[in-house]
Amino acid sequence: MLKWIQGGISSVTGIAEPEYGPEFIHSATERVRGKQPFHETSRQDLAWRNISSTHVETATFYFTQIQTGMAGFAQIIYSKIGGLPRTAQFTFRLHHASRPELGTWTSTKLENFRVEGANFYADNLSLELDSTATSYTLQSSVTADSVVDITFKRLTPGVKVGEDPTTYYGDNTKEPWGTMRHVFWPRNSVNGTVVVHGEMITLKNDYSVMILALQGMKPHHAAKAWNFLNFHSETHSVLLMEFTTPKSYANTKVSIGILCDKDSVLSVTIDNEVEHVKPKTDEVGWPVPKALSMKFTGIPSSVPDKEVASAEKLSARVDIELKNLVERVDVMAEIPAFVKNIVSGVVGTKPYIYQYANEALLTYAGSEYKGFAWSEVTFISEFEN
């Protein structure tokens, strides 16, 4: 059980946490250092955690149509804050490079929701994992502004970092006061339709990433910044999920990279470098980059633990000119009230998500691959050394 009170008075008041130090964060990536990071997901890994303590749990399905530059995501948010009743939300984002009038953002409260293993149901919405645990079908008509009927079929194995893909906060991993957990389907085909602005858009053998996440603590206490990449080409997919903790947890970086070819996971990397190229402070006060350069270093996914030390390194790089900003999301203006209440009024906390959709270049094994990337740069709280 999560015990926020163990995190000190800050968990109750929202004030800055004391400096606990690096020994108070136990990351999933550090547990696999010197071992094979890649572990394949099981059906149980895909089940909603549905824990009783305070948390925010999400299932996010990103989609990319390389030829048209259409990209976006559908997301279910399932949350419990303190002693309040559980709440659920469906959010949907669509960006279309050649037809900007189709751009859509919806956020809709869900009613009469429930979870059943990996499945989620609400009035006018269903998310179901098939019996073979190789495809999800998402159907939603909770709002006429984004009607969704799409199926995501796994093209590669699912990915988790280690047997337990959870990062724990606190001095006792058996009774942590905070957690962060991610599991991934890094390369999927997506088929179906979405209706926006009264127009039906067809997805046919396009590409997708699926991410299940659980955050079991206040977002501004868990991380001060995030970097995210969802890159697809016809032959490869690259995913990055990276966050940096606040000073209270020693500015610790937890970075997960996944490199795939058409049908396999080539490497899961935990030693990644993200360069924010030519950052410039914008009107809200954050140093926004003009480009991103992401370097991934790891070992082949087939290497067993006993051979990791002697294994030949594998590396890749993704470069993106951030020419197209889809949205600068003022999180405090967009998030549901139940989440806003836990971050409002915190000094130095001004969360913004910068969402981009751009062409990108993957460099791997001496070759270059052009593709399309949905990337996000998130700033949550002031940077301190």
Curated annotation (Swiss-Prot):
Alphabetical keyword list: Cytoplasm, Endoplasmic reticulum, Golgi apparatus, Lipid transport, Membrane, Nucleus, Transport
UniProt KW Secreted keyword: no
Subcellular location: Golgi apparatus, cis-Golgi network membrane; Endoplasmic reticulum membrane; Cytoplasm; Nucleus
GO aspect biological process, one term: response to oxidative stress
SUPFAM superfamilies on file: AttH-like
InterPro entries: Ceramide-binding_SVF1, Svf1-like_C, Svf1-like_N
Record membrane topology: Peripheral membrane protein
Keyword Iron-sulfur among UniProt keywords: no
GO CC annotations, alphabetized: cis-Golgi network membrane; cytoplasm; endoplasmic reticulum membrane; nucleus
Region of interest called Peripherally associates with membranes, as start-end residue ranges on this chain: 1-18
Spans traversing the lipid bilayer: none
Source organism, top-level taxon: Eukaryota
A GO MF label: ceramide binding
Functional summary from the UniProt entry: Ceramide-binding protein that may transfer ceramides from the endoplasmic reticulum membrane to the cis-Golgi network membrane, and is thereby required for the biosynthesis of complex sphingolipids.
Assigned protein family: Belongs to the SVF1 family.
Name the UniProt record assigns to this protein: Ceramide-binding protein SVF1
Organism listed in the record: Eremothecium gossypii (strain ATCC 10895 / CBS 109.51 / FGSC 9923 / NRRL Y-1056) (Yeast)
Gene expressing this chain: SVF1
